[in-house]
Amino acid sequence: MKEILITNDDGYESEGLKKLIKMLTKEFKAKITIVAPASEKSACSHSITLTKPLRFVKVGKRFYKLDDGTPADCVYLALHALYKKRLPDLVISGINKGANVGEDITYSGTCAGAMEAVLQGIPAIALSQFYKKSEKELDYKNALQITKKIIQNIFDKGFPLEKKEFLNINFPAKSKIKGIKICKAGKRVYNFEAYSNVNPRGVEYYWLAAANLDFEDEKNSDIALLKKGYATITPIMLDLTAYERMKKVKKWLKANDE
């Protein structure tokens, strides 16, 4: 029997997580463990908690919320505390409410859950559902169907990537999708703002905000294809070295020494 560990960054009560658990329980004869944050941890990236203790709070059969933990905390502690004899065959992070594309991947708690898994040597996928602000209720039907297909492929054929690599998967908002595309991550155009105010005691405070976010116009990027109605799969590697720039930096350093 296969073993699956699930986490997310929207919190243990999120709709995307509930839909995913229901589908996996119905479609796969697998031992499923869920460890999710006790509250929403969107955009927490790959942060882990080192300054205070964490605790599992059981909310169901093999279902735990991690008291004030991040997605990376959830995966790390689950692998080290809940799995004594055998590690999971697959870690799934999601389904996130909102896309995780382009450089947003670096901010994403959803993607960080998958990153932590592959750092620990476990194959992982990150799942995110794109939606429009006008949508009152998200439709996860396509996301669940595609996720089922991908997981079945992993179990039947093995994980398609090398160590320390994961699949970042995004699902379009459209009810009828055009297909699945393997593509690169796009390039975000950021425009961050910070709104200041003063509390009743005269102390200034700030709210961080991301206003008018956009992407560079790239034909075959994840965000471009997602907007056209395709589900996107982007292989992500944790090797951050810019190999093509090494010679340039070496030459630059040598020039500075002369």
UniProtKB/Swiss-Prot annotation:
GO molecular function, one term: 3'-nucleotidase activity
Gene3D superfamilies given in the database record: Survival protein SurE-like phosphatase/nucleotidase
Principal subcellular localization: cytoplasm
Protein name, entry field: 5'-nucleotidase SurE
Alphabetic keyword roster: Cytoplasm, Hydrolase, Metal-binding, Nucleotide-binding
Binding site for a divalent metal cation: D9, D10, S42, N96
Cofactor binding mode and count: Binds 1 divalent metal cation per subunit.
Similarity section: Belongs to the SurE nucleotidase family.
PANTHER family with a match to the protein in the record: 5'-NUCLEOTIDASE SURE (PTHR30457), 5'_3'-NUCLEOTIDASE SURE (PTHR30457:SF12)
Function summary: Nucleotidase that shows phosphatase activity on nucleoside 5'-monophosphates.
Signal peptide interval: none
Catalyzed chemical reaction(s): a ribonucleoside 5'-phosphate + H2O = a ribonucleoside + phosphate
Cofactor(s) needed: a divalent metal cation
Location of the protein in the cell: Cytoplasm
